[in-house]
Amino acid sequence: MIYKVFYQETKERSPRRENTQALYLDIDAASELEGRIKARKMVEEHTDYNVEFIELLSDKHLDYEKETGVFTLTEF
């Protein structure tokens, strides 16, 4: 399952929508909830990012992300 993680680069400042960035993770999970938990844990262990939201991408949404050219999987 591919998850899109929305985050701020630092926890030091208040989140601002215009500074929100995203990364994509391929997570092996039995359920959507388990995948969200694993994704948050991975990001928190490997970065200082402030995670805002984690979204499971549907096939159509994933295709759209690939078409726009912003899709690249992040590996830790």
UniProtKB/Swiss-Prot annotation:
- A Pfam family that the UniProt record links to this protein: RpoY
Q: Which GO terms describe its molecular function?
A: DNA binding; DNA-directed RNA polymerase activity
Q: What is its EC number?
A: 2.7.7.6
Instruction: Write out the entry's keywords from A to Z.
Output: DNA-directed RNA polymerase, Nucleotidyltransferase, Transcription, Transferase
Query: Which regions span the lipid bilayer?
Result: none
Question: What does UniProt give as GO cellular component?
Answer: DNA-directed RNA polymerase complex
Q: What class of enzyme is it?
A: transferase
Q: Which GO terms describe its biological process?
A: DNA-templated transcription
Q: Determine the domain of life of the protein's source.
A: Bacteria
Q: Which reaction does it catalyse?
A: RNA(n) + a ribonucleoside 5'-triphosphate = RNA(n+1) + diphosphate
What family does this belong to? Belongs to the RNA polymerase subunit epsilon family.
Q: What's this chain's function?
A: A non-essential component of RNA polymerase (RNAP).
Please give the subunit comment from the record. RNAP is composed of a core of 2 alpha, a beta and a beta' subunit. The core is associated with a delta subunit, and at least one of epsilon or omega. When a sigma factor is associated with the core the holoenzyme is formed, which can initiate transcription.
Q: What is this protein called?
A: DNA-directed RNA polymerase subunit epsilon
Encoding gene (name) = rpoY
